[in-house]
Amino acid sequence: MYNEDSIVNLLKEKSATKQIVYSKTKDVFNKLVLALNKKEKSIASVLKDQVKNVELEFKSNGEFDAQLKFAGDTLLFHMHSNIFDFPPNHHILNSKYVKEDNLRSFCGVINIYNFLSDSLKYNRLNDEGFLIGRIFINKEDNFFVEGDKELDFLFNDFANQKINDELLDQIINVCMVYTLNFDLYTPNFNDVRLVSVHHLLAMSMNQKIKTSKRLGYKLSHENK
């Protein structure tokens, strides 16, 4: 049977750890917001005398969201307010680093989404964005990134990699290059051949036929 001591011990151990992880993740997100703002200014200063029609815009949307718009794409960075552990079959739990201290597996999460800028501009509620990566941060500032292509292997040394300003800048760069190379494909004809009157009227008002970069897209880790 459980007693109050077991409850107190769990509160001291897990709850305290989660509070530390939340604080660490919030600090990282605040640094990420500053890095995104700096990135927008840096690229804009280079482009201003070379390309006139490439729009760049940084926007902070409250405590947990930040956007970086460049040309036709927008990266949305969202910090989740909860702290997570990993499912039993996740490879992180098999690492020596986590086995030495199982509380190291508790992580805060910053999700990275790619949306078409016009989807947000025109409030096209049917449009879809894509989760391209997730940054996991633990109580010791160790981190790894889970995502697609480069995002899945460039930042995966959880045991030895601590988050810092330089690595945040690199993550932003990789996300931007990945997004710019992830082009918009025209949908299959049969997927869009039927259009209701409702959709037609909505389209005439605000272009609300669903648009997304790909159909059937998955992160690389989902195919493992």
Q: What is each stretch, according to the model?
A:
Residues 17-24, 28, 160:
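Non-transmembrane, amphipathic alpha-helical segments
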Residues 132-224:
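Glycine-rich, aromatic-bearing surface loops/beta-hairpins
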Residues 1-18:
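N-terminal, Lys/Arg- and Ser/Thr-rich interaction peptides
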Residues 57-143, 147-148, 152-153:
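Hydrophobic-cavity lipid-handling domains and compact docking modules
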Residues 10, 14, 35, 39, ...:
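Residues that form generic nucleotide/phosphate-binding pockets
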Residues 24-67:
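Short N-terminal edge-element motif at the start of the domain
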Residues 19, 41-44, 48-51, 179-187:
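Residue-level signal for secondary-structure boundary elements
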